[in-house]
């Protein structure tokens, strides 16, 4: 006897936009008019690689009529959020549940963990001592750095077996020095994404006062400062052959070539906007939905920030560290959806300990992982009305592609014509950026003469 298509695919709907703290009982109440197969066992939540709720779930129903009833709940609200309901099937459900969450094949059986919250200047020896008694494979430790060669506060460690990695996870929230360390399951694929630097962002880096533009070959004309040179020489802290095991990144970053990053999207939370610190943040969002915080107490921890946004559940928190190794009082917080980022803005001007905290939205509806194109970047940096220090304000910036013109906001005689691309919306208050460009422009023009 042949099963019908519906019988083979089941009666499944996918739900998106659930509150982070949502339980199976709450989903049952949301679908109270529908008959869910096996009760709460028919509700399958989707989790991130770190084991956090993704805000999505599959719901198995008893018949096609129940599916139709469930679809009528689309765009109804649960708490303060509206919930989307889509028709799905058991094939999609099985595949997604198998390939997501902390126990997916992408994260299992390779022995990787990711550490977050390391003290500034933490060495590999300190990490080895932290995991004393647990065998780490040779060259199995990676300490990523940002574009200025500074530690990001994260590390990847590969243990000799998955069983040892599981033991390492039990040290979650233990301390190195005065900092408690968060430990998450990771994978070789995640390590690769940290090894492949955001090349488009390199092209956007502010030139130093002694950097000189190249011969006007698109991205190749961007000055390469000392921080970039440190990273180009393998300043990721060793391990895995200095990129070579992951595709030979030591051969160069593809300046002026087609290798110039067409595969990754990033949400910029820094740039030269001095409201975001000096010259940009090392934070790179994978969702494109971020909120920037300013005015944090200097003793604030990542856990304090998670609690600040409760009941929302941020995916990631990045506390900025200044060149002197001290916290700047600013942080970037990544959310899974634009709706969550907008909801988080309700906390603007709320107090954390003895200080009120300012929030700046860096998210647009319908984006995921930034707003990249092969040839241009559009950044939407929205600030609250009257906020000071915003070089870009709420202007839209477009450009930075391969172009023969630039529009950094000065007179035409002061603008570069060698391939910077341009497109800062006519802003001229770029925290010294114009002056540097003018100096570089005069050097560049004298070389051509």
From Swiss-Prot:
Assigned keywords, A-Z: Acetylation, Isopeptide bond, Methylation, Nucleus, Phosphoprotein, Repeat, Ribonucleoprotein, RNA-binding, Ubl conjugation
GO CC annotations on file: nucleoplasm; ribonucleoprotein complex
Keyword presence, tRNA-binding: no
Domain of life of the source: Eukaryota
Region annotation 2 X 16 AA Gly-rich approximate repeats: where it falls in the sequence: 234-433
Location of cross-link Glycyl lysine isopeptide (Lys-Gly) (interchain with G-Cter in SUMO2): 35, 87, 98
Membrane-spanning intervals of the chain: none
Phosphoserine modified-residue sites: 23, 54, 63, 90, 310
Subunit description: Component of a ribonucleoprotein complex containing mRNAs and RNA-binding proteins including DDX5, HNRNPH2 and SRSF1 as well as splicing regulator ARVCF. Interacts with TXNL4/DIM1.
Name of the featured protein: Heterogeneous nuclear ribonucleoprotein H2
Species per Swiss-Prot/TrEMBL record: Bos taurus
Gene: HNRNPH2
């Amino acid at each position: 006897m042949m099963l019908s298509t519906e019988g083979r695919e089941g009666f499944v709907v996918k739900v998106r936009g659930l509150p982070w703290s949502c339980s199976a009982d709450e989903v049952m109440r949301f679908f109270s008019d529908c008959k869910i197969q096996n009760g709460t066992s028919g509700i399958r939540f989707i989790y991130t690689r770190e084991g956090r709720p993704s805000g999505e779930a599959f719901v198995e129903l008893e018949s096609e009529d129940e599916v139709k009833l469930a679809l009528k709940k689309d765009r109804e609200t649960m708490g303060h959020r509206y919930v989307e309901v889509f028709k799905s099937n058991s094939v999609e459900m099985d595949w997604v549940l198998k390939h997501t969450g902390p126990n997916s094949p992408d994260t299992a059986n390779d022995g990787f963990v990711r550490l977050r919250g390391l003290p500034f200047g933490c060495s590999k020896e300190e990490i080895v001592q932290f995991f004393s008694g647990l065998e780490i494979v040779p060259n199995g430790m990676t300490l990523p750095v940002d574009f200025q060669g500074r530690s990001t506060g994260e590390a990847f460690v590969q243990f000799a077996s998955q069983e040892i990695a599981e033991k390492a996870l039990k040290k979650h929230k233990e301390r190195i020095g005065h900092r408690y360390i968060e430990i998450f399951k990771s994978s070789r694929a995640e390590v690769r994404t940290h090894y492949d630097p955001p090349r488009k962002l390199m092209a956007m880096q502010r030139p130093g006062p002694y950097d000189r533009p190249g011969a006007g070959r698109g991205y190749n004309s961007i000055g390469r400062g000392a921080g970039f040179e440190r990273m180009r020489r393998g300043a990721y802290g060793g391990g895995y052959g200095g990129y070579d095991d992951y595709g030979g990144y030591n051969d160069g970053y593809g300046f002026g070539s087609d290798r110039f990053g067409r595969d990754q999207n990033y949400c910029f939370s820094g740039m030269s906007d001095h409201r975001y610190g000096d010259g940009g943040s090392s934070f790179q969002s994978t969702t494109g939905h971020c909120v920037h915080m300013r005015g944090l107490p200097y003793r604030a921890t990542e856990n304090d920030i998670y609690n600040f946004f409760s009941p929302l559940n941020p995916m990631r928190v990045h506390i900025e560290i200044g060149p002197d190794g001290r916290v700047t009082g600013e942080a970037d917080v990544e959310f899974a959806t634009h709706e969550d980022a907008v909801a988080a803005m309700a906390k603007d001007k709320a107090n954390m300990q003895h200080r009120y905290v300012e929030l700046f939205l860096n998210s647009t509806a319908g984006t995921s992982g930034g707003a990249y194109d092969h040839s241009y970047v559009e950044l939407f940096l929205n600030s609250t009305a009257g906020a000071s220090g915003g070089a870009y304000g709420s202007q839209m910036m477009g450009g930075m592609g391969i172009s023969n013109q630039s529009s950094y906001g000065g007179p035409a005689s002061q603008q570069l014509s060698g391939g910077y691309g341009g497109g800062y919306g006519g802003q001229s208050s770029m925290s010294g950026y114009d002056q540097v460009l003018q100096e570089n422009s005069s050097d560049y023009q004298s070389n051509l003469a």
